[in-house]
Amino acid sequence: MAHVSFKSKEADSMSRWSKYLSTEESPPSASLSWRAMGVDGPQGSASGQKHLQMEPVVQLSKVAEGLLAKMYRLNSILDYPDPNAHTFSEAFWKAGVMPNFPKICITLSKKFPEHPNKLQLEKVDKFALDALNENAEGYMQNLEQWITLLLDLLEFREQALRLILDLSSTVITLLPHQNSLILHAFMDLFCSFVRVNLFSDKIPRKMILQVYNILHIMLKGGRDCEFYHRLVQFVDLYDPPVKGLHEDLNFVSPRIGEVLEAVGPIIFLSTDTKKLRNEGFLSPFHPRYPDILTNSAHPMRAQDLANVTSYREWVLLGYLVCPDELLRVTSIDVAMVVLKENLVLSLFRDEYILLHENYQLYVLPKVLESKRMAKSGRTKQKEADLEYNVAKQVEKMLMEVHEQALVSADALHHERRILLKQEIGRMVLFFTDQPSLLAPNIQMVFSALALAQCEVVWYFQHVGIASSKSSRGRTVDIDAADPTIGFLLDGMGKLCCLVRKYIAAIKGYALSYLSSCAGRIRFLLGTPGMVALDLDATLKGLFQQVLHCLENIPKPQGENVPAITCDLTDLRKHWLSILMIVTSSRSSVNIRHLEKATVSTGKEGLVSEGNAAYNWSRCVDELEGQLSKHGSLKKLYFYHQHLTTVFRNTMFGPEGRPQHCCAWLGAACCFPECASSIIPEEVNKIGRDSISYVESLIESIMGGLEGLINILDSEGGFGSLEMQLSPEQAAIRLNNATRAKAVSGLLAPGHESYPDNSSSVKMLEAAMQRLTSLCSVLNDMEPICVLNHVFILREYMRDCIIGNFRRRFHSMIRTDSCLQRPSVIESLLRRHLSIIHLAEQHISMDLTEGIREVLLAESFTGPFPNLQVFETPTETHGGGSAIDIISNWYIDNFVKDASRTGVVFDASQNCFRSSQPIGGGYLAEAFTDKRELKALVRLFGGYGVDRLDKLLREHTSALLNCIDSALRSNRDALEGLAGSVNSGDRIERDANLKQIIDIETLADFCIQAGQAITFRRLLVEAVGAVLEEKVPLIYSLLKGLAMQLPEEVPDKNEIIRLRRVASSVGVGDKHDAEWVHSILAEIGSANDNSWTLLPYLCAAFMASNMWSTTAYDVNTGGFSNNLHCLARCVSAVVGGSEYTRMEREHRRSSLSNGHMDELQEPELLSRVSAEANIKSAMQLYVKLSAGLVLDSWNDTSRPYIVPKLIFLDQLCEMSPYLPRSTLEVHIPYTILRSIYHQLYGASLMATEPMEPSPRQSPLISLAHASPSMKQNRADTTPRSHTFEPGYHSSSGSQYDEGYEGDRRTGERQLRSMRRSGPLDYTGTRKVKFVEGSSSGSHGAGSGSLQRFAVSRSGPLSYK
C-alpha cells in the first residue's frame, strides 16, 4: 500500500494543487488576467528588480475554495459532528470514515495531543482495539483521502501565509480608489485563509490524525507516520483556529487595519438608506439636480457599492483575527455598523459560526488585555490615556452590540430591502422606457444587483438562527411572509433581463468609451510630469501596448455592434502588469509618482484612467461574467428549503404578487453552478435538488393558479353574483322606478347592493387581477433550464388549467349523495368556462381546444357505430369516465330502478317520476324532463348519447335474450295455445297458459325493456330538439332524408346506417321497432320460427298476477308498476322481430335460389308487407288478449279487469302499427268510457270539490267518444285514458315548451266540433278503418255496432 508522504519542496509546491485548479470551472474574469500574467508578465525591470507575482495569489484563492468544498463534503458525510464537544451521531460511526469504535476514537480525540501509545487504550476497550488491529489495513484506506486533506491544509497554511506576508510588506498602497484590483486579490486570499482555518474546526481533525497514526503504528511496527508530528503541531496551534490566526496574522495586522479603515466610508454609505435615497446613488438622475446623471455625479461611490458585500466580510473577518486593529479610533464605528446588522459569520456555503459569541470569546479578551496594559502605564501617559479610552469604548461596544443586533438587525435589513425594492422598481421602469441610458449607468445596475443579492442571502442565512449565549436567550425574528424578498428577486431578474436585452448597446458604449480613453491616456503620457519620471523600458513598453490595444479597438457603427467580437484580455493583462510594477516597493516608479505626475492636469490621473479602462473593457467581453457575479443567486441553493417555505408564504399572501413566481423559479437556473468539480457526486446531487426545487415551486404555483380559479368558480365567487337579485325582484324594482308615483315601501334601484357586499366584490376583483396577472407572467416567462431539464411554464399552466377543469367537471357531476342535475352541471360548466376564457385572453395558447379535448375525452367511449366506419381495437377503449358515471346512474335508477324509489313513467308530462328522492337528492322528474335531457345532450354531445344508447342496448339485448329463451323453452305450450285459440277450446287454452314457465319473471323483464325503450325515446326526442335548435339545417336534412329512404327489406348497409342515424335523432314514427330490430340483428336473435309465437307469449301476460298489484294513476296516465311501458315493449319487440324474420326469410330464399326473380323482387323487398305482417301480429295480440280478459270476467276478478282494459287501450293508442279503433272490434268502447269516467270523476271530486271541472266540458265527451269520430284530426291520435285536451301522435311527437299553446288551440277546435255530454254515444255511429292501413287514417268500409245501442254507464258482461 502506498501511504501518504509529505513533501515541502518549493519546486513542486504548486503542483500539488492541480487537483484543486480544475480547468472545467470558469474562473472569475479577473483571474483570467492574473493567470495570463504568469506566462507573459514581466519578471523584473531593467535594473533586475523582482516585482509582484499575482498568479499564486489567485491560484491559492481557488485552492481555498477546493479545500472548503472537501471539508464541507466530509462534514456532510459525518452528519455534521461537533468535535469540540465530542458529540457524534449514529450516522457518524456508520459513514465508513472512522472505525465504529466510539470509545477508543473519542478517547484519542479528547487526549490530543498525547501520543496514542501513552493512552493505554487496552483499558478503554480491549475488544475494539483488537478489532482495530485486525482490520487496520481497511480502516487506513478509508482515512487516506482525509489525512491527505489535513496535509493540504498544512501546506496551504504555509504557502498562503507566506504570500500574505509578502504582499503586505511589498505593496505600497492598498486603497480601494487607487489599487482596487490588487487590493481585492490580496483580501480575497486573506479571507480565504481565515475561512479555511475557521472551517477546519468543524471537522474531527484530532480524531482523524490520531486514529490514522495508531493504524500506521499497528501496520509499521510501532513507527509514527512521517508527517505525524508536524500535523500535531499544526492542529494544536489551530485549536481553536482563531488562536492560531491571531499569532500567524499578527505581522499583517496593521495593513489589514488600513484596508478596513479605507472601506469604512463605503460601508457607512451602504447602511445610510436615507442618504442613498436622497442623493440618488441608485437612481439614474440626481434627485436635487435632475439635469445631470448620477453616474457623473459620484461614479466611484456607485461603483464601490457593488463591492460593499466584500467590504463587510473583510470587516467581520479582519477584526476577528486582527483584534488589535479595533483599537483604532475610526475602527469602532466601522465595526459597530457591521456587527449590529449580523448575527452569523458565513464561512462557506451555508456553514457559519456565531459572530458575537466568537467576538466575545476571542476579541474581547484581547481588548481587555490592551486596556490593562494601557492602565498599567507601559506606554507614554498621553498615548496610554487615549489607548485606554479607546479600549474602553471597544469593550462597551462589544458588550452591547450583541443585544442591539438581536433587536435591530432584521429591522435594519428590512428597511434596506424596502429601499432596494423601490429603487430597483424605479430603475426597471426607467431603463425600460429609456434603454439608451442603461449603458452609462451599468455600474449603478451592478451596485443595485449586488446590494439586493446581499440582502436576499442575508435573509435566508438568518432564518432560524438562535443565539446560544445571549443574556436573554433571544432569537432574531425573521418573517417568513415578508413580501420584499419576492420584490427583490423579481427586480433582480428584470434588471438582468434588461442588461441581456441591451447587451449590444452596452458593448457599443463601452467600445466608444475605450476609444476616447486612448486619447486621454496618450495625452497623460506626454505631460511634463510623466516625461520627468523617466520610465524604464519595461513600463514604457507596457504603456505602449495598452495604447496599441485601445487604439485598435473596432469602431461601433450602426447595426454592426452585435457582430463585433473583441477580446480585450491583452489590454487587461498589460494594465495589471503595470499595476504590479508600480505598486511594488521595489520599483523605482510607484503608483504615487504616476498620480502626482498626471493629476496636475486637472483631469483624472493616469492610474484612474487606466482603472476605468480596465473596468469598461470587461463590459465588452466579460459582461455576462460580471452580471453573474453581481446578480447570481446560486448561493440560495443551500437554503432552497427555506426558499420554498418563504415562497409559499408570500406568493399568494395578502401582499404577495403572483407575478414574482418567475423570479423564484429563475433562481434555480444557477444552482448547478454551486457544484464543485473536485467532488463529482455534488454535480448530480445539486442537479437533482435543483430540479426538485423547480418542480416543487411549479406545483405550488399551479396550486395557487387552481386556487384562484376555484375561488372565482365558487358560490362565494361568481356564484354569488348570480344570486344577488332574482329576475322577478329586478322587474318589480324597475317597474316601480318607472312609475310616476312609486309604491311606498319599495326601495329604489341602487339600494339592493348592501354595503357589506362591497368587500366581496373587491375580493372578486383582486382575485381576477391576480389570475390575469399570473397568467400573463407565466405566459411571457422564458423557459427554465436546469442542467438538461427544460421547464416551460406555459405548458405547465395549460396542463394545470385543463387538469383543474377535468377535476372540477367531475366534481360538478356529483353532489354529496346523488348525481347533479344536468341543467345545473351545464350552468356550473358555463361559469367555469367563463373564467378560463378570462385567463385565455392573457395566454398565447388555445385553452378552448384543450377544454374541448377534455369534454370529448369525458364523452368519447368509441366511434359512432352508424357514422364512423373505422374500427378501434377493444384494448384501446378508454376515457368517457364522466359519461360512464352518468349513463350507469341513469340506467340503474330509471330503467332498472335499483334504488327502489318507485320510478314510473308519466305519460302526461313525458318524463319519469318517483315517489321519493333518488339518493336523498331530487325526484326522478328533475332528471328526466325534456329540459334536463336537452342539457345532458348539450353537455356530452353525440358521443355521450351514443354511450347511453349503448348501455340501453346492452341492457335491452339481455332482456331480449330472455324473451328468446322463453319462446324456445315454452314453444310447445305456445303452439298449443295458438291451436286452442284457433279451435276455440277454452279448457285447453287455460291448460296451455298454465304450462308457460316463469311468466311473472318474463313480464318483469318485458316491463324493464319497455322502460328502456321509453327512456331511449325521451333521449332521442331531446337529441332531435337540440339538433333542431342548434343545427336546424342538419336536422331538416335528416328529416327529409328519412322520408326518401327506399322501402326495401332487407336494406343495404348504407341505408341501414342512414335509417339508424335518423332514428337516433327522433325522426320518424317507428324508431322503437327499428331500434329493437338493430339489437336483434346484432345479437342474432329471432332467427327461428319460435318468434312467430311472440303475440301468444305476450298475450299470456294477461294471466299474470301482476295485474292484481297495479293501479291506474289518473295524474300520470300510467300504472303504478309501469305496465304501460309493457305496451311500448310489445309494440316495439313485435315490430322489430317481424323485420328480422323477413330479413331472415329473404336470406334463406337468396341462398336456396341463388338469385331472385326480378318480377317478385319489389313485392318481397317492400317494407309495406313487413308492416302489414306487424299489424296482423299486433291485431292478433289484441284479439287474443281481449279474449283472455273478457273470458276471465267475473265478480271477483272485476278489479283486475280494469287495468287490463286500460292497458289494451293504451297499446292501441301508442302503437304506430294499430288503428286507434282496433280494440273497439273486441271490447265495446262504452266500457272503457265508463271506466275512465269513474276514475277521472273520482279524482276530480277528490281534488277540486268546490270548482267546476274543466274536464266536464264538451271536449271531454269527444275525448271519450268512439275513436272513429276522432280520425278527422290530421296528425294526432287521442289518448282515451287522459283528460288532457292535447294528444301525442302515434309517431311519438314530443311534449315540449310549445305544448301548452297547442293544447289550448286544440281545445277550442274540439269544443266547436261537439257539444254533447260524456254519455252521448248513439247506435247510429259507424266505425270505419282499412284493415291494411298501418296508421290512424281510415278509408272505405264500415261495420255496424248494434251492441252499443244497449250500452249502460257501467261495464257490461261480455258473452
UniProtKB/Swiss-Prot annotation:
InterPro entries: Nck-associated_protein-1. Residues 1267-1359 are annotated as: Disordered. One of its GO terms (biological process) is cell morphogenesis. Pfam families: Nckap1 (PF09735). GO terms for cellular component: endoplasmic reticulum membrane; nucleus; SCAR complex. Residues 1272-1282, 1300-1310 have a biased composition (Basic and acidic residues). Signal peptide: none annotated. Binds PIR. Involved in regulation of actin and microtubule organization. Part of a WAVE complex that activates the Arp2/3 complex. Belongs to the HEM-1/HEM-2 family. This is Probable protein NAP1. It comes from Oryza sativa subsp. japonica (Rice).
